[in-house]
Amino acid sequence: AISAVGDDELGKEIVDELDKNHIQHLIEKVPYPTGTVQVELREGIPTYTIHERVAWDHISPTSDAIDLAEKADAICFGTLAQRSRQSRETIQAISSFAPKDAYRLLDINLRQRYYDKELIEESLYLANVLKVNDEEFNVLRDLFGLNGTEREVALWFIEKYGLRMFVLTAGSSHS
């Protein structure tokens, strides 16, 4: 795990949990609060309030992170974590150092106003695996002006961006 937390109780709790579970991490402590998300359920449908100006908006490209990426078998990154310029540049730089045969999984997170087509395309060119849920799939279909079946749209992304795999997860209505 590569990220940033605040020098606060939540940040300490996160680092302690990673350590307890023997998860290798490069977590930088920064002078911003640890990020939180408030989730409200209205008739079973979640709405998110994603707090801004938090630690994970300030991830730095350390030499240790680049060294780790160069040896990685897999890297997972998302679009939400790239909402700030600093973290976007860091995540994209670190991801670019992964070996060509490593899995570079883009777990797209299309939340509120924290994405645009440019960010998605930049991330797709770094990825070789794309994971989306059914709601995100429909947003991507509209954003890229695509028609066709789920399979046809998935194949378009695979061909256009040179993906190894396109993973579409279904919500509870499709289980």
Predicted segments with their positions:
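Conserved N-terminal subdomain of the carbohydrate kinase-like
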Residues: 2-79, 97-100
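Short beta-strand/turn micro-motifs composed of small residues
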Residues: 3-5, 108, 170
